[in-house]
Amino acid sequence: MSEKHKKIEELRSQRWFAPDTIRAFAHRQRLQQIGLRREEFMGKPVIAILNTWSEMSPCHSHLRDRAEAVKRGVWAAGGFPVELPVQSVGEVMVKPTTMLYRNLLAMEAEELLRSLPIDGAVLLGGCDKSTPGLLMGALSMDLPVIYCPAGPMSNGQWRGVKTGAGTHTKKYWDERRLGLIDTVAWEELEGAMTRSIGTCNTVGTASTMTSIADAMGFTLPGASSIPAADGAHPRMASQCGSAIVDLVWRDRRPSTWLTDKHVANGVAVYMAMGGSTNAAIHLIAIARRAGIDLTLDQLAAAAAKIPVLLNLFPSGTALMEDYHFAGGLRALMRKIEPHLHLECEGATGQSWDSLLADAPCYDDDIIRSLDNPVVSLEQGATLALLRGNLCPDGAVMKSSAAEPRLRRHSGPALVFDDHETLSRMIDDPALEVTADTVLILRNAGPVGAPGMPEWGNLPIPKRLLEAGVRDLLRISDSRMSGTHYGSCVLHVAPEAAVGGPLALVRTGDIIDLDVAAGTLNMRVSDDELARRRAGHVPQHKTYGRSFAALYQQHVTQANEGCDFDFLQAGEAVPEPPIH
């Protein structure tokens, strides 16, 4: 353990426990009420374990056990652990989308850490929105923290084929729609694709965000790829518990070490992974909580320099477990050293130049080099930024996952005002659609849905699937699962619900996309758009009460991170008075 910099009386929790007052008496009394001895908590760093465990969140179903491992580490290092449940925001089960609740998790995390006698925290999460939500809240409170990622699930296997969560779900669902997979095989696939605890085993949003957190310095170095079911995972969790006690004594709050260079390291890893487009939104939100300005232009500039190096689904052919045993994050970062700020020290105080010096790569096909990428910059990028009269504030596309023929495309729009209409009509044999048609879904953004669900990978109409078409140009103000693929333009800003031009496009308008030029336009004159705007009537549902109402009133647009306008970096909130 490093030399202590703080004295016991400087611990934040001492305000609750140390004074000879009636209020501090009550605090000490209540801990003894549950069977704790004074010597177990007095004069020790109080470590919160923010746990997103839930029986409705399969990705986090093991985090109750991991919390016990963290506690072992905290006790061993001389701290006092307390487990605090927070909402799980696990994908799949939560409707309409977990994105609706990311900011709520951030608020919950921040206020728990502020309102209780906490000196530092271990953040237990992993599924998509849990990582940014926990980090955003922790950054706003600014206590020493370590992120303990849930870890990816084991490789999927089905009839001799390696299968990845999300990626193959989409592929096989299209085959089932065509009658190529019967019910017996379909039900068999349910139990074969997701075989263990943990997050998606592809480069989805979960693995993208935990890897970014790792590269930025919030985890124990290299922790992000450890499989959830591996014995190394609880050992890592215990180490997190020991490490956070050390960080408290050293006062390693994020504000003392996190800089724009740390964010840039996270961005570089994001691009090299071929990561989820969702990370663009989350990274902007995380950076802004730390008072660091990050824009879509900066993300796109990094994507234009760093090709996709990970040979993992959906861009490649392997899975996260393979990546871990090929060397994991340290091996990947060593391959992109020219694009990193190696002097950056993370929460633990270790710099990347020392951590990468001896980082081995055991499989150069899974973790490629800059001169032998999985997807070259000429073939596509992790993130392409588009602007034009359809998206003046920007839209994004994962061009590395799109068909080459559609990266420069013109075609007539087929517009759907809501997801229900889309679902009802998409397989109608009479639907007027060709391989050149541009499918558009609107009112599916942050305000319009609300919560910006992952509806952006619009299904291919059945009549086109039957004709052999497997990709179409699709545009929406919603998001897409990081496990998916296809020519999908996402995060159109401003969204339709706040009056963005997407609200004005009509079926039959010609849409022009040029990924290389970074443009997305509709062939409609300014005068005609003005006429349409004058007669426009908003189509989205509005909420008068509940969290959805708060969300619609205060959420920012995709290019701004979809945070609440009152939660971004600003004046520090004072410590709570104790009376």
Curated annotation (Swiss-Prot):
Belongs to the IlvD/Edd family. InterPro entries: Dihydro-acid_dehy_C, DiOHA_6PGluconate_deHydtase_CS, ILV_EDD_C, ILV_EDD_N, IlvD/EDD_N, Sugar_Degrad_Dehydratases. Binds 1 [4Fe-4S] cluster. GO terms for biological process: carboxylic acid metabolic process. Its cofactor is [4Fe-4S] cluster. It comes from the Bacteria. [4Fe-4S] cluster binds at residues 59, 127, 200. Induction: Is highly up-regulated during growth on sulfoquinovose, compared to growth on glucose or succinate (at protein level). This is 6-deoxy-6-sulfo-D-gluconate dehydratase. Gene3D superfamilies: IlvD/EDD C-terminal domain-like. It comes from Pseudomonas putida. Its EC number is 4.2.1.162. Catalyzes the dehydration of 6-deoxy-6-sulfo-D-gluconate to 2-dehydro-3,6-dideoxy-6-sulfo-D-gluconate. Is involved in a degradation pathway of sulfoquinovose (SQ) that allows P.putida SQ1 to use SQ as the sole carbon and energy source for growth. Homodimer.
